[in-house]
Amino acid sequence: MIQARNKLSKEELSEAKKLIDCCQAYDGTYRAPYLSNMLNFDPNMPAFFLYYEKGELVGLLTVYADDQDVEVTILVHPNHRRQGIARALFTSFEKETASFPIRSVTFQTERIFLERHPDFVSNWGLVEDENTEIWLGKDRRPYPLAKLSNLEVLLAD
């Protein structure tokens, strides 16, 4: 069963984060989808499509739409893949957002996912965008507080 929402409840947000963590651990991915509609051009447009099976969230489509060129991310629990859940989510997205002025849809994913699922692009009839984002990271290094004279640490309430 698919439910479309323009905003996630606390429980749905918790379920979504759990599903994202599971998919990331399985796929070796790191980028988390945006789980708010705060920046979407129309706050009434559905931005979250949740696929439940026997009361468990097994699929999620998120929409980031700060303008009419929207980005979607689709996540399906590893144990429920290749069962049409992603397509059902995308079909629901197309139907539910048909009345909104969407100009284009871009699928967001990571290189490692495409390498592990080489048929994904062709199966969906997609064209890879060469203008992809590059995410850089750096390991954190501890900063001894005693040596930072311009820093005051307070406990939050």
Question: Where on the chain are the PLM-derived regions?
Answer:
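Conserved beta-hairpin
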Residues: 46-59, 154
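Conserved catalytic-core motifs of GNAT/GCN5-like acyltransferases
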Residues: 108-110, 125-141
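Conserved active-site tyrosine of GNAT-family acetyltransferases
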Residues: 117-122, 126
